[in-house]
Amino acid sequence: MQPLRRLMGLVTAAPLLALVAIAAAQDANIRQPIADLEQLLAAEPLVIAQAEISRPKAKGDITLRAIVSFGEAAPLLVKLRKAEPGADTFNNVPRYDIAAYGLQKLFLDPAEYVVPPTALRMVPLADFAKYSPGVARTFSAADQVLAVVQYWLNDIKVVADVYNPERFAADPVYARHIGQLNVLTYLIRHRDSNLGNFLLGNAETGARVFSIDHGVAFASLDSDRGT
């Protein structure tokens, strides 16, 4: 029980120094106000300007790294992931991604979100097919593709494990972020440890941690990669 109490203490403690570091990290990783990004991703007219497979060496990867225009705003770099027909296949359930994004709002302030701004959009099939040959309409009644649209984080890196025990013990702000990530992934029953699902900020102290893929969560079957 003692380790759990210690972790919860780190999660809830908020000294002034920690808040300053958190604000700095917010600017480094998510460079626009959360509310503005939510409006752009969810509601403004969407036009794909350029896109490519985000991990071309990963077999079967369907996630696009895309430059997208949203209305009159400057183009944004986003993650664009198509749903398969029916929008309910293993490791590709768009409603889980939007649910994970929304759930964190119950206990985290925007400056400490561990899931970057995320929305669901319907994209015309012809537009999506330019960058994803063979893509099919998600629902038979609409000539469109349901897609997860997620803000592409800045100043981050992929590591084998975002949790570092030594850093956790020495850096209270980093420890706080790890605790917040741990709480969310527990609540949503995140069960896919695939490399790249969790990202670490590049800040030397107070680095943020993020969860960007939630296809194997909630009521999903377990991943063969483990948890």
Model-derived features with residue positions:
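A broad structural signal for short, well-ordered beta-strand segments within beta-sheet-rich domains
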Residues: 46-52, 145, 178, 206
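Conserved ATP-binding subdomain of kinase catalytic cores across diverse folds
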Residues: 50-156
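Short, intrinsically disordered, charge-balanced linker/junction segments flanking boundaries
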Residues: 22-25, 222-227
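N-terminal secretory signal peptides that target proteins for export/translocation
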Residues: 1-5
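Regulatory N- and C-terminal appendages and interdomain linkers associated
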Residues: 22-65
